[in-house]
């Protein structure tokens, strides 16, 4: 019946609804239709491609970061396969996870090219997971396969929160950028302050907040407090990003941003996302933090463009006044 509907041109939304009502597999039952605005059918197709072709291993390298006094930050690739990458929503308590890198930072990376989003845990004990997402934005003069895409993801949990924050410190140094984090967890700032590294933390995205929350008053603080309105805005930003066409393949078919996601955990989170259980979706929360930084740049650019236009009009008016026009 489902194949008949598909052959007759049923929409992705209709097919997803059928999967929820008549699931053939547990993964189909896992998907959510109520509060999930992401393109589920397209994401499922991408997940199947990643699984069948082993793209998570082909495109990404697992490893750990360390700091060398002479060489700076070093990425130590897990050649002996000692680390366990978390690929699914079901996690064993002894799995600490690892960093997966899809693209290392380019040489002499300009400040602001990369964005880091961080979803911290609230206490040392517990089963919640930490997630970091490193996003490479699009900057003039920088051309590469991963522009406007995710270049690294960490998903896991260390024994102490200091160890969790240390990952963000090294990522920020390696990619020459700052970390945007959910600031409901106060010890993130405390850690970086103690390390005299507050410059590695991103300031609150005032433009994004003002646009998402009416009558918002903002002050310059580190990180971002995730309100309902901001999560709603973040979800919409992610949806728009997923569906962006970035190129066309050899057959002339469009390639979307979601077709360049190779992390199975993120794909599963996007497919099964439920706003009512948002705290379960660690990578999405980190991605929202990264996307907010991208959007903040767009909003700042729009403001600058408008300011330039207004300045131009004022100069023209003044010039005409001098000419007696």
What do the PLM-derived regions correspond to, one by one?
Residues 201-248:
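Short alpha-helix plus adjacent loop in nuclease-associated cores
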Residues 1-204, 245-325:
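RNase H-like, metal-dependent nuclease domains and their acidic two-metal-ion catalytic environment used
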